[in-house]
Amino acid sequence: MRIIGIETSCDETGIAIYDDEQGLLSHQLYSQVKLHADYGGVVPELASRDHVKKTIPLIKAALAEANLTSKDIDGVAYTAGPGLVGALLVGATIGRSIAYAWGVPAVPVHHMEGHLLAPMLEDNPPPFPFVALLVSGGHTMMVEVKGIGEYRILGESIDDAAGEAFDKTAKLMGLDYPGGPLLSRLAEKGTPGRFKFPRPMTDRPGLDMSFSGLKTFAANTIRANDNDDQTRADIAYAFQEAVCATLVIKCKRALVETGMKRIVIAGGVSANKQLRVELEALAKKIGGEVYYPRTEFCTDNGAMIAYAGMQRLKNGETADLSVHATPRWPIDQLEPIV
């Protein structure tokens, strides 16, 4: 079975073709970073219009890369939510339309389930069950995963997502958009210990998180100090250290609560080198294992949607002829695969 996956939930247009025997056959990705750079963030209307322009050409490119035609495709998977409603509707409309034209089933995919299952694309996929840390610009949550669709949210951010806090703090520091990766790069030049940021909500029980206070703490620290390059690097180091430490503390608690020793980290922030190092150290300390996707599959992409869609189609799930987008869609509302 071959599935084409379409991802248009925010500011990346991703198309991929996945074969249940051969694995990933093609992967096309277009980022709208340059389009939104002048605005310092994603402009939903511009994102939607650009998806309209790019999705069909990328579908053609993905087919060409895999040396396939539409007749070789057995199903179409598209991101139906959560995300920007206009951007979602572009992918959903195109996905549902080409499925109808090609005479194959279509299946809506949950964006965060796609991220959660992205490590399954690797040569050493994680076996169930495990604890998943889904950490991106729009979501930060800890999920107990017993199987595909068997999700229990253990905790989540009550305000800003971790990736959002990275980007907003980077903007406060005068870094270009998107600032999160640039802040992490700047942090590599920072001096450990010069600044000490708090670890929010780690002094109380529970697995919920909060990152808006770190952004405020960073703003106050920036105002109170010189704006030379080394000071900015030291602040970036302290901020990243606090975010990573907070996430690792929560992961450790989640593993204790569930009795598990396997953790999956996925989403855009899962590409953060410091976070990976600290989670690997945690796993080694407890005799556990940590899994994450390759860097190109940490950000939004069509490969994760194609894979997740494959699992749903095999379970007999399909979409009707109507087009739906669900900008808010809790992951624990998904049906388990039987």
UniProtKB/Swiss-Prot annotation:
EC number(s) recorded for this UniProt protein: 2.3.1.234
Keywords carried by this UniProt record: Acyltransferase, Cytoplasm, Iron, Metal-binding, Transferase, tRNA processing
Gene3D superfamilies: 3.30.420.40
Residues engaged in binding substrate: L134, V135, S136, G137, G138, D167, G180, N272
Reactions catalysed, as given in the entry: L-threonylcarbamoyladenylate + adenosine(37) in tRNA = N(6)-L-threonylcarbamoyladenosine(37) in tRNA + AMP + H(+)
Domain of life: Bacteria
Pfam family, one: TsaD
GO molecular function: iron ion binding; N(6)-L-threonylcarbamoyladenine synthase activity
InterPro entries from the UniProt entry: ATPase_NBD, Gcp-like_dom, KAE1/TsaD, Peptidase_M22_CS, TsaD
Cofactor(s) required, per the database record: Fe(2+)
Positions of Fe cation binding: H111, H115, D300
UniProt keyword Transferase present: yes
GO CC aspect terms: cytoplasm
Cofactor detail note: Binds 1 Fe(2+) ion per subunit.
Locations listed in the record: Cytoplasm
Function: Required for the formation of a threonylcarbamoyl group on adenosine at position 37 (t(6)A37) in tRNAs that read codons beginning with adenine. Is involved in the transfer of the threonylcarbamoyl moiety of threonylcarbamoyl-AMP (TC-AMP) to the N6 group of A37, together with TsaE and TsaB. TsaD likely plays a direct catalytic role in this reaction.
Similarity annotation: Belongs to the KAE1 / TsaD family.
Identification of the protein by name: tRNA N6-adenosine threonylcarbamoyltransferase
